[in-house]
Amino acid sequence: MIDTWSQFKKARIFDLSQPMFRGMPQSPNHTPFRMVLDRRHGDILSSEGDSASNEIVVTGCHVGTHIDALSHVSFKGKLYGDIDANSVMSHTGFSALGIETVASFLCRGVLLDVAKFHGVKILPADYEITVSDLEGTLKAAQTQINEGDVVLISSGWDHNWSEKELFQGQLHGAPGIGEAGAIWLAAHKPRACGSETIAFEHIPSGLGHRKLPVHRVFLVENGIHIIETMKLRELVQSGVVEFLFVLSPLNLVGATGSPVRPLAVLV
């Protein structure tokens, strides 16, 4: 145990989350992030002069860096495990497959830098990451994907974070894997996959977020969680391929997702 603690004292930690603020880039399909002070310093004072401030936050659970629960997407009325969506859904949330059922992550993470594989800083907005791209990137990284891993796919898209319309991909699309790439990844049985973009998967130019086949393949057909809007730039720049991945969703009973602050740890 002593040796373990001494190793962690030297650990390097990468924060893989984007900051949350009013007006941040996000999917147009979800309630925007808003935060206001509910009580300001000086509104209420104790007899000794003490004061406190607090806020109210309103946001969709799929805004900012977040993870999808398996209740997030259905196909022809069915959720993962052939569960009828209507039978477990109410105005208060889901009685099955909610985010509270997702255990914390403490596992091996694998980074696939597809932009580097192509020799570019950022993949084009309308680029679909193919099976050949994934295979080539994995081979170049001299690693493998094991069952239960978390696989992070970098397109360099977080370099566009400050350009809201471009980052959201509404007009020009966003890079990501397509259905074929999702099927290939699912065959390796990762516990979750993530990327820098809002939707994780390829968004064709001009189509917006209307068609998301990768969500069906992962969430409905294979029970693989999706982590979106990640900040991977520093991890990519470090040159690491394998790392300890840490993530814990909020314990929101019946919710279809949760904001998260994932970490990559090098020991």
Language-model segments: what does each one mean?
Residues 1-267:
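Active-/binding-site microenvironments in catalytic and ligand-binding cores
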